[in-house]
Amino acid sequence: KKKHIPVYRWLIPVTAVAAASLLFVFWLNNQAYDTIHSADVQEFVSAANTPEKHIELITATGTKIKVDEKATVAYAQDGSLLIDEKKIATRQSTGEGEEEHPMNQIIVPMGKHIKLQLSDGSQLDINSGTKVVYPQKFKKEYREIFVEGEIFIDVTHKESNIPFIVKTSLFTVNVLGTAFNVKAYKEDTKAEVVLVRGK
């Protein structure tokens, strides 16, 4: 049985009126993006075995780091990884090309959950049984992550003019500054997106 993060309990469906007022910043699309290659990312996700007892962070070089559920995990603006405010050595971004924006993955097993701050300041609450793939440092044109499982994300308003894209195997969400919940477990036939706050 999946363990849900308490914050999810007060999430409510968006009304038709609210949804209509948010269409210009929030839309759902079944079409693939040309940014993150879904097939490649899904292969990356599938290749990583889910640990049974601990949260695992996999760097672009393949290094596996065990992370405590209560640890503070954050990425600085330059892509540096800090765990409990201690800098962890990783491959750094050196340019604007696809290969120069190394991808990391965090895997949360059943019965665990964790919070993570992305390089732009956006906050993730990652639920149990979830895998998230994300760049150490976002590109200038867009911000994009891939999710298999369930997360609550509070997108920072600092870069509200830059699209934030959440991809799953079933759909894509494109927002600006907003907060929402995404549920897209691999074994489930139905996926959900619940908008909590937006412009």
Kindly give the residue locations of the regions a language model identified.
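Short, small/hydrophobic-biased targeting/export segments
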Residues: 40-79, 88-91, 96-199
